[in-house]
């Protein structure tokens, strides 16, 4: 697939001299969580503050009452901009900091490039422009920096209950959460959400903070800014299940801005209604971040209760669909799939789905490590298992370099193919670095390891899965943890 027409790669040149921490998002975008609260961005949830924006009274800024200008120039957002311009990593940006320092392509670097591709030069928030037009206290004006990027989670409606997820992002998690930990409440943005039994004897929130998509204050502000949008990022839950987002996209078509808009999703692509295909063909480009974490049973275990055959079927539908699509594999790497990671990469390299990573510089996948919950973070793994991983990674990299393998699966004289192979090897190198990036105190490490076994065993009991059979190499290294102290949950 050709690159987007009329791209503005020269925008990247305006980032010369930018500190590592610089990201254009605090200047150009508004982000909304699944509970309707405003946040710094989708990656800020890994921080202690969770990146939640607050008003002058210390309350969470919410779509039902907050105005966009107040959010953009809130104390947190002004501080984030000021810290970035000083060359510091702001507190909400800890996830990008960790990933960048491990050699990964962190979200802030990705945003510098993708926004340069899809934003008119006069609207692009380059480092030079940000430095010139941001006030000393970190505040900005809508005239200088219009909101061109809108990031929204329309609630937590989902059809899966992924291992690394929680009730905040999937309504399928309520009962399992209670059965695993014994809690009848959970927390989101500092608010305690009580769970009660409904008429079907299933747990649900006593006050459903995730049902807000028809709020008139939100739509008033969206429609006031809709003509300046150039990119919309839609997440869930599972966004393709949420009717409100299709109504929103239809409005974009009706007012005549769809052909200027790039849609970006994170979706498990297990459930794509015909309405989606009918709408997508009207937009400039649809970037689909495909949330899969392995092949076959590994993905079925992690993204329960998905079926691998259905995902492969929908990959094929994307290759034939009317419209412009760019699919990225946006995996979350954790203890359950780190062993299969090189095999997963090889699957993507050799299956050659035409719309998966179609651009010359597009990597074969854009994985990110699980930071939280810590009991799934690869940093807690035994050192002996990490050494086995390093050896396994080395063997795969050697295989990908071999002439015989290159002849069978690719064109060694093709620069694009060589670039993808090099990127595949870098993925393994970066995760090798990352799994040594966090040093835990002894008692903390014992807690996370003990929690890990409790968690995975309870999930098997509830769901009828078998993590030990699906991930035998991992189990062999973790079974010594059964001797650790219990009751640390």
Label every model-predicted segment.
Residues 253-256, 321:
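Short, acidic, metal-binding catalytic loop of nucleotide-sugar glycosyltransferases
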Residues 2-20, 26-29, 64-151, 169-172, ...:
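N-terminal [4Fe-4S]-dependent radical SAM core
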Residues 1-66, 70-71, 109-115, 174, ...:
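Radical SAM enzyme [4Fe-4S]-AdoMet core and its adjacent flexible, acidic
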Residues 26-29, 35-38, 47, 90-93, ...:
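Extracellular structured ligand-interaction cores
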Residues 147-157, 168-214, 226-243, 255-275, ...:
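Core AdoMet radical
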Residues 23, 41-42, 93-96, 158, ...:
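Short cysteine clusters
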Residues 215-220, 246, 250, 275-276:
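Leucine-rich repeat
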Residues 150, 218-221, 248, 311-314, ...:
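Alpha-helical packing segments of well-folded alpha/beta enzyme cores
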